């Protein structure tokens, strides 16, 4: 079961998801999707039960937004480079560089190549907070990718993104998921922007019940 303190939000559940590919958890606002994401990432403890992995997990979370004002002097490069070095003080083994992981390229080259991969080439020196919503998500995805994550959780990635941005960002996410071994888990209340059939849908009801719909 998941929740906050002694307050249960949803569960109990029992389900499994294969490594790699695009997986989507969908459900109405307030049903526990973000709480599930934080529990999966070990940012908050489960009330009961355990999350079990059959791989060594190295997860990154792409939040809905970073609380930065437009005059905050942090560049796109700075945000993405953090993926190489930062280890949030959560006590979680899912964050930071993999044990023994070393970089065989300069950080500047790694970041530049990843920005090109997500469609932000030439934007290294732009202030992150002045990017559009879709561009910010791309930068945060790049930060997850430079960290060599094998699990990327995107929390409502289309919030604050216009229609044109939704289409291009949706294509980026699905292309990355289908052409890598990374498990992408998208948390959303609206899956209409996803241009392909995901590996599976995890449907969460308003009452906290979950159903699994694998790709046929």
Show where each model-derived region lies.
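Helix-to-loop junction immediately C-terminal to a conserved catalytic motif
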Residues: 41
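Conserved ABC ATPase "signature" region
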Residues: 95-123
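Conserved ABC ATPase signature
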Residues: 127-131, 135
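Hydrophobic anchor residue at the start of the ABC signature
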Residues: 141
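Conserved catalytic motifs of ABC-family nucleotide-binding domains
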Residues: 148
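Catalytic Walker B motif of ABC-type/P-loop ATPase nucleotide-binding domains
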Residues: 152-156
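H-loop/switch region of ABC-family ATPase nucleotide-binding domains
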Residues: 187-189
């Amino acid at each position: 079961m998941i929740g906050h303190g002694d307050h249960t939000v949803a569960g109990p559940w029992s389900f499994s998801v294969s490594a790699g590919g695009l997986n989507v958890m969908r459900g109405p606002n307030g049903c526990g999707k973000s709480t599930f994401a934080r529990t999966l990432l070990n940012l908050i403890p489960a009330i009961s039960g355990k999350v079990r992995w059959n791989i060594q997990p190295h997860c990154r979370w792409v939040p809905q937004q970073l609380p930065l004002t437009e005059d905050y002097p942090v560049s796109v490069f700075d945000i993405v480079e953090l993926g190489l070095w930062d280890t949030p003080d959560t006590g979680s083994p899912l964050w930071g560089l993999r044990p023994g992981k070393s970089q065989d390229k300069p950080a500047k080259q790694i970041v530049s190549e990843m920005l090109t991969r997500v469609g932000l080439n030439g934007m290294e020196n732009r202030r992150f907070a002045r990017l559009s919503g879709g561009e910010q998500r791309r930068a945060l995805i790049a930060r997850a990718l430079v960290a060599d994550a094998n699990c990327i959780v995107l929390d409502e990635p289309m919030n604050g993104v216009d229609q044109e941005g939704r289409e291009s960002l949706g294509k980026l996410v699905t292309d990355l998921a289908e052409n890598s071994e990374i498990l992408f888990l998208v948390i959303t209340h609206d899956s209409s922007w996803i241009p392909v059939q995901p590996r599976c849908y995890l449907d969460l009801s308003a009452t906290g019940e979950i159903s699994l719909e694998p790709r046929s």
